[in-house]
Amino acid sequence: MKVQSSVKKRCEHCKIIKRKGRVYVICKVNPKHNQKQG
């Protein structure tokens, strides 16, 4: 999972999720796209 200051969807399968005040991008099809805002 990459930690980035600005997270964006990288494909149509990516989902933006907020958990505990953090923003995550979760992608089941391509796990390389997983990101966390930090």
Curated annotation (Swiss-Prot):
<dbReference type="GO" id="GO:0003735">
    <property type="term" value="F:structural constituent of ribosome"/>
</dbReference>
<dbReference type="Pfam" id="PF00444">
    <property type="entry name" value="Ribosomal_L36"/>
</dbReference>
<dbReference type="GO" id="GO:0006412">
    <property type="term" value="P:translation"/>
</dbReference>
<keyword id="KW-0689">Ribosomal protein</keyword>
<dbReference type="GO" id="GO:0005737">
    <property type="term" value="C:cytoplasm"/>
</dbReference>
<protein>
    <recommendedName>
        <fullName>Large ribosomal subunit protein bL36</fullName>
    </recommendedName>
</protein>
<keyword id="KW-0687">Ribonucleoprotein</keyword>
<comment type="similarity">
    <text>Belongs to the bacterial ribosomal protein bL36 family.</text>
</comment>
<dbReference type="InterPro" id="IPR000473">
    <property type="entry name" value="Ribosomal_bL36"/>
</dbReference>
<dbReference type="InterPro" id="IPR035977">
    <property type="entry name" value="Ribosomal_bL36_sp"/>
</dbReference>
<dbReference type="GO" id="GO:0005840">
    <property type="term" value="C:ribosome"/>
</dbReference>
<dbReference type="GO" id="GO:1990904">
    <property type="term" value="C:ribonucleoprotein complex"/>
</dbReference>
